[in-house]
Amino acid sequence: MTTFEEAAQKVKEFTKKPSNDELLSLYGLYKQGTDGDCNISEPWAVQVEAKAKYNAWNALKGTSKEDAKAKYVALYEQLATKYA
């Protein structure tokens, strides 16, 4: 089984780029798994990329770090079949 740390490294080695939605899901799960609940102020709506990342992370509020890491690994394993 792949560990969270291995998955986080291997995502960077994908030969094809996942969709923006997939990347945002990975980002949110990674931040929740490493930092816990979102602890930054909400970006302005005109900061489109920052706002999307904030929303992806904040949507996971209340998810434990362990659950977020497990979901990250599961998502990585799913995406690896398409992008690795």
Swiss-Prot record:
Task: List GO molecular-function terms, semicolon-separated.
Answer: fatty-acyl-CoA binding; protein kinase binding; protein kinase inhibitor activity
Query: Domain of life of the organism in this record?
Result: Eukaryota
Q: What SUPFAM superfamilies does this protein map onto?
A: Acyl-CoA binding protein (SSF47027)
Q: Which residues does the UniProt record annotate as the domain ACB?
A: 1-84
Query: Which UniProt keyword terms apply here?
Result: Cytokinin signaling pathway, Developmental protein, Differentiation, Lipid-binding, Sporulation, Transport
Q: Which GO terms describe its biological process?
A: cell differentiation; culmination involved in sorocarp development; cytokinin-activated signaling pathway; DNA damage response; fatty acid metabolic process; protein processing; sporulation resulting in formation of a cellular spore
Effect of gene knockout: Cells form fruiting bodies with a reduction of 90% of viable spores and without SDF-2 activity. Diazepam (Valium) can mimic SDF-2 in Dictyostelium bioassay.
Tell me the residue numbers annotated for binding an acyl-CoA.
K12, Y27, G28, L29, Y30, K31, K53, Y72
For this record, the Gene Ontology CC terms, alphabetical, are: cell cortex; extracellular region; vesicle
Decide whether keyword rRNA-binding is in the record: no
Family designation: Belongs to the ACBP family.
Function in brief? Binds to acyl-CoA. Processed into the SDF-2 (spore differentiation factor 2) a peptide which triggers sporulation. SDF-2 appears to stimulate prestalk cells to release additional SDF-2 by acting through a signal transduction pathway that also involves dhkA, regA and PKA. Induces encapsulation of prespore cells in a dhkA-dependent manner. GABA induces the release of acbA from prespore cells and induces the exposure of tagC on the surface of prestalk cells where it can convert acbA to SDF-2. Glutamate acts as a competitive inhibitor and is also able to inhibit induction of sporulation by SDF-2.
Q: How does it assemble?
A: Interacts with dhkA.
PANTHER family documented for this protein: ACYL-COA BINDING PROTEIN 1, ISOFORM A, ACYL-COA-BINDING PROTEIN, ACBP
Which protein, by its recorded name, is this? Acyl-CoA-binding protein
Give the classification, highest ranks.
Answer: Eukaryota, Amoebozoa, Evosea, Eumycetozoa, Dictyostelia
